[in-house]
From Swiss-Prot:
Residues 353-365 have a biased composition (Basic and acidic residues). GO terms for molecular function: aminoacyl-tRNA deacylase activity; ATP binding; valine-tRNA ligase activity. A motif ('KMSKS' region) lies at residues 552-556. This is Valine--tRNA ligase. Disulfide bonds: none annotated. The lineage of its organism: Bacteria, Pseudomonadati, Pseudomonadota, Alphaproteobacteria, Sphingomonadales. Residues 864-930 form a coiled coil. Residues 351-370, 691-717 are annotated as: Disordered. It comes from Sphingopyxis alaskensis (strain DSM 13593 / LMG 18877 / RB2256). Its EC number is 6.1.1.9. ValRS has two distinct active sites: one for aminoacylation and one for editing. The misactivated threonine is translocated from the active site to the editing site. The C-terminal coiled-coil domain is crucial for aminoacylation activity. GO terms for cellular component: cytosol.
Amino acid sequence: MPMEKTFDPAAIEAKWARLWESRGLFRPHRPDATPFTIVNPPPNVTGALHIGHALDNTLQDVLIRYERLRGKDALWVVGTDHAGIATQMVVERQLNERQQKRTDFTRDEFVDKVWEWKATSGGQITRQLRRLGCSMDWSREQFTMDPHFTRAVVKVFVDLHKKGLIYRDKRLVNWDPKLKTAISDLEVETHEVQGGFWHFKYPLADGVKLDDGHDHIVVATTRPETMLADMAVAVHPDDARYKSVIGKFVELPITGRRVPVVADEHADPELGSGAVKITPGHDFNDFEVGKRAGFKPAEMLNMFDGDANVIQTADGLIPAEYLGLHRFKRDGIDGARELVVQRMKETGFLIPHTDKDGNAHDAEPRTIQTPFGDRGGVVIEPWLTDQWYVDAEKLAQAPIQAVRDGRIQIVPKTWEKTFFNWMENIQPWCVSRQLWWGHRIPAWYAEDGRTFVAETEEEAQAEAGAGVILTRDPDVLDTWFSSALWPFATLGWPDDTELLKRHYPNDVLISGFDILFFWDARMAMQGMEFMGEVPWRTLYLHGLVRAPDGQKMSKSKGNVVDPIGLIDQYGADALRFFMCAMESQGRDIKMDDARLAGYRNFATKLWNAARFCEANGIAASTSLEAPAATLPVNRWIIGEVADTVAAVEAAFAAYRFDDAANAIYSFAWDRFCDWYLELIKPVLSQKPSPLQGRGLGEGDEAVPAPADGPLSPALSPEGEREIAETRAVAGWVLDQILVMLHPFMPFITEELWTGLGDRADYPLITAKWPAPNAARDAAASADIDWLIKLVSELRTAKAELGLPPGARLTAHFPASLKDRADKLAAQLDRLARLETISFDPAPAGASAQLVVEGETITIPLEGVIDIAAERERLTRALAAATKERDSLAGRLNNPSFVERAKPEAVEKARTDHAAKEAEADRLSAALARLG
């Protein structure tokens, strides 16, 4: 059946996604081949595909398809994360819509409802990954709450506890007062908030005074409410103003608490008064200062409950009027902050701020970087609480060494410094969460306070004794704890499965740099602890996908791009190719509709090239090796294929997705479609060149050959051989393009592969990567490269001189080019559109000079154009372009503009300057051609 005239991405995408999966072509099925394994970073089961997912999964699929074509036993592990907080919130919102809440149910009843939600609504993102063309092994789809995965999680927790690497401790956590749980740093977003900077007097106790005679220390704070739990005032040890009072005490207003003045380098002598209030129970920096000052976490004061309402501190010094107040003003009711400021003002301990107009205010206005929970949407409270922690410092040592000795390669290498800096200063990892949905912590408590950690309740009971009443820990594990086991638990661990033996370690992990520490590093820790080997040999970190103006995408900015919408508009192949072509190591990607449209056009061009081949009797190749060829154009294109294969392979080896994509793009569009198919048209049609008989070569007269079917009996044997050779080479080259392009654009390439040949039982996805055994033919390459340069120069000259592309001109060649011109007569006639080629000296007068590889070809212009008028037009245009170019250069050379203007304005000026500079150069060249 002939190919459709137009390319319809939607139709072929649905067809091939279904056929590939139904035929099991995504599964590893080559037991004797070298395995190649990637695990997909498990997206949240609640999630929808965002543009970052599209980039991440496209890069993985490109590698999987590439290695599959190279004959490896490729496994791409797919699955979803149970996403504790996110999933619990989704289900709670559904309950709220029915005027119900989570606490209306028992824990088990609520968890059952979450499982019901997953069964009906939890597969959106996996359906979207299929639309992107991801060739994951869907038959082994994983979920982090599956029974076998849960068994692995519990075993890891218990084993780490036995080794002393998991323990319970009192430390500060990011507490979300709305969700009432600790959250990870990744779930904290920092926003700029307009707030205040209050200055308070803290009286020195026991009659002590500063050297300047003052009886108080001035402290400044953005959180006045936390003074109710202050435990110290810190000053820099070298700050001469306070040396005499280090070790003395201040008596806090409101509470009357005596707190020491401590020396700590955290205090900055250049900032404010140089003294800072220390609240270890509600500030991460203060927590560390407090520990250095000798306070144990158990002694640190906590003034908030889980709702961020004021509670009494352990010393009982907070006045009753503050108890029960929220930390901030809420619903029109003053909070602890407002009341503290009011009391400090009333008692004379508030130092007002005077603005530039002389007006007094309680606080100095400040823009404050404030942490918010990304899901709860409220300000995070650093909160002192008992949680479970992993001794990350000990677990980090093996991955650090693995990166140092090269067992783990981080690409780009520039990320190694960041990796080492974080891992070498790693803090204990809080792994407990106050949720109902998730992996329940396998710990049970006896009434006497003893803790029993075991894989089952029966084991815990046996350890505690038959008569001991046990209560299970109500918390669940951090989602990152379970997903850290992904590289080996998905392969069957803790069972010693064949899949685990074959596919661990994984080969490569593709990850966004933003989860390097939350997921990647923790996988390395757990993998090396429990498997004794690195989880993957290469860690590739990509950047962000940004809005067209370079801003980070966010819902609040309204600049989020839906990848499914892009697939609907441009096709999955175009989106995938865009992601790869733009993926340059260490750089973010800017969305660009023009480029997306360009890659959609690339798919259309490939489709049309295949239609041309079909219409001209060019069929699928039957050989992996290049056909025998004698014609220079065929020998040239075979060499170009070999060079392109080598370039693509080198790019993949270096994880240069952009170089690989651009190499095949350049070859397919430029070399094959724009040049080769044009160059072989004279061969396929066998029309004698009108230049024959003018010294350009000999040849039998020929009649046009039919596009398909038997060759004309009037055609010479040599003509028949040339057509057959050219069809074979063209078919083989198109096959190599389809194979090389398949990892990037799987849908259109599979459709063309099957449509151009009887290969229904030999799909492209399982074909073989090109291995051309032909080297570049230097002579053929030199001839065709020269021809391409000549035609390009001639086309440029026509455009510059305002001549139509089809204008036939006379050209004077140097005698040294006669043999080459004879050999390429047919191609010169078709592509160069020359009326006459002469080897005599050019006549005097205006002419265009084309310099190709050091040889000058002259095109007389007398009688072709109005020389004087054209010179005048070009002179005016050049003056205008030069003026605008110089004006833009002046702006760009002005530091005031470059430093103060919006980045997008500066970038536009640079782009415009480059365009005007190129225009001026082009016009100058055109003037020079006129002589």
